[in-house]
Structures are given as structure tokens and as C-alpha cells.
Regions:
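N-terminal beta1-alpha1 ligand-phosphate binding loop
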Residues: 2-26
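Helix-loop-strand module that forms the ligand-binding subsite of alpha/beta enzymes
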Residues: 39-113
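Generic anion/oxyanion-binding catalytic loop in active/binding sites
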Residues: 4, 36, 60
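Residues at the starts of beta-strands that form the adenosine-phosphate
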Residues: 3, 33, 87
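A short beta-strand-loop structural module common to alpha/beta enzyme folds
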Residues: 31-41
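Short linear motifs at secondary-structure transitions and domain/linker junctions
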Residues: 10-13, 27-32, 63-68
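Short helix-loop-beta junction
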Residues: 19-32, 110-113
Length: 113
């Protein structure tokens, strides 16, 4: 069985709706166990548990949400000794094209050791 971590932040509900749809779809797979967490609730232990991660965020001022950035701030350096290099996906709720948020999430996630 594979472990999938879904981490998201939503202020207005749009990203939460998307996250719930992703979670429903992933939960239908028999060989996938999911953890579905708001960004403020996720931590290093969740990251270490995961075989793959899906990040969800609204695009705020061309960037990811502060809550998702907080998750990265809390886990990036503590993750260093664990050699985390997981497959990941990103979804963005956006009034623009969302590329700013995707670009910055990519930059951070690819930097995990």
C-alpha cells in the first residue's frame, strides 16, 4: 500500500472544494492510503510517512498561500537528514493563471534533500 499526503490551504472555500475532490478520487484506489490535512495541521511526521504528496493552494498575489509557505518553513530544514525526494502534484485555485504559485512550490519542493 502507498501513502499519499494531501496538504492544502483554503480561505474562501475554492481550494478546499478542489482538495476534497482530489481526496475523493484518491480514496477510491484500493492500494492508496491517504492523509488529508490543512497546511497548518501538517508536519514533518506526515511528510516522512508519505510516499507521494499533493499540494493545494490558492494563488495569493502571484504566490502560494502563507499557510502552505508556513508548512515549508516548518519542515524544510528538519527534513534534511531524511533524504526526502518524493513525487508530488500541485493544484492551484486562481483568478489568474496560477503559474507564480506553481513555480515557487516547485522551487521549494525540488530543494528538499
Amino acid at each position: 500500500m502507498k501513502n499519499l499526503l494531501i496538504i492544502y490551504h483554503s480561505q474562501s472555500g475554492g481550494t478546499a472544494s478542489m482538495a476534497e475532490a482530489v481526496h475523493r478520487g484518491c480514496s477510491q484506489e484500493d492500494d492508496v492510503k491517504t492523509r488529508f490535512l490543512r497546511a497548518f495541521d501538517a508536519n514533518l511526521d506526515d511528510l516522512l510517512w508519505a510516499d507521494a504528496i499533493i499540494f493545494g493552494t490558492p494563488e495569493n498575489f502571484g504566490y502560494m498561500s502563507g499557510a502552505l509557505k508556513d508548512f515549508f518553513d516548518r519542515t524544510f530544514y528538519p527534513a534534511e537528514p531524511h533524504q526526502i525526494n518524493l513525487p508530488y502534484g500541485i493544484f492551484v485555485s486562481s483568478g489568474n493563471d496560477g503559474t507564480g504559485a506553481v513555480r515557487e512550490i516547485d522551487r521549494i519542493v525540488k530543494g528538499y534533500p
